[in-house]
């Protein structure tokens, strides 16, 4: 049996929602124990995860430093959190397997999700992310190409597209590793939203992919028998 375990971003934080490094490591250890128990029953497990709180932390760093250094684009934030959480989860998985006498290799893949450049969400971004800011602070980020909306008394808030994922571009690598016996962490945060240009080249775009759509697409792509969604 092949299972896709989709961990929400909040499942990678403490019970009260804090996302300090030690909180995320502790949460990963809890999730890894459950995965190792499935592996001990000869169940194939692929792990994917959200990254909302983690990207949120990076956005705050962007906001605080925007007057000094250019903000890191959202697709780069997604790539950074995929790598960080992938590393944390691999360490936790290997420790949990060792405790149970299991010897399985692990791998974490920075994964891209193909979206349509003409998706209507890009023309009218519907997804609010990050903190509310006063107009003068939001204006600095608008100068760097971000889209912010006036939300009245609360202040200004950034909005981004939420396109439908069409394809997990790195699914063949995920499938090959799973078939070779690896416990794989992949498609974190729904994958890095990526568009294909007319010349065939690929380009990351600033967007957020719905967590349920991304998990369902990955499960179908990998031929998973079961999709498990873990939350806090």
Segments and roles (model prediction):
Residues 6-13, 168, 175-213:
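Catalytic-site beta-strand/loop segments enriched in glycine and acidic/polar residues
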Residues 6-8, 48-49, 105-112, 186-188, ...:
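Short beta-strand segments
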Residues 191, 222-232:
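Glycine-rich phosphate/pyrophosphate-binding loops
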Residues 21-24, 60-70, 123-131, 199-207:
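A glycine- and small-aliphatic-rich helix-loop capping segment at beta-alpha/alpha-beta transitions
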Residues 1-48, 58-59, 63, 176-181:
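N-terminal glycine-/serine-/threonine-rich phosphate-binding loop
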Residues 24-31, 72, 200-226:
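Gly/Ser/Thr-rich active-site loops/lids in small-molecule metabolic enzymes
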Residues 64-184:
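Ligand-binding beta-strand-loop-alpha-helix segment within the catalytic cores
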Residues 34-41, 88-98, 217-225:
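Alpha-helix C-terminal capping segments
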């Amino acid at each position: 049996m092949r299972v896709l375990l989709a961990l929400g971003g909040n499942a990678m934080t403490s019970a009260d929602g804090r996302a300090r490094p030690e909180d995320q490591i502790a949460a990963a250890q809890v999730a890894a124990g459950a995965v190792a128990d499935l592996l001990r029953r000869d169940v194939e497990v692929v792990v994917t995860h959200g990254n909302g709180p983690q990207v949120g932390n990076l956005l705050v760093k962007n906001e605080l430093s925007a007057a000094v250094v250019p903000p890191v684009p959202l697709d780069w934030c997604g790539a950074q959190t995929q790598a960080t959480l992938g590393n944390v989860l691999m360490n936790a998985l290997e420790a949990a397997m060792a405790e149970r006498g299991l010897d399985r290799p692990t791998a974490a893949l920075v994964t891209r999700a193909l979206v349509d450049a003409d998706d209507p969400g890009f023309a009218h971004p519907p997804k609010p992310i990050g903190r509310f800011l006063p107009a003068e602070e939001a204006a600095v980020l608008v100068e760097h190409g971000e889209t912010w909306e006036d939300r009245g008394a609360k202040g200004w808030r950034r909005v981004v597209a939420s396109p439908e994922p069409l394809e997990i571009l790195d699914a063949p690598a995920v499938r090959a590793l799973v078939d070779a016996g690896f416990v794989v962490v992949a498609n974190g945060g729904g994958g890095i939203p990526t568009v294909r240009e007319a010349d065939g080249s690929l380009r990351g775009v600033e967007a957020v992919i719905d967590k349920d759509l991304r998990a369902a697409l990955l499960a179908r792509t990998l031929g998973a028998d079961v999709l498990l969604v873990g939350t806090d």
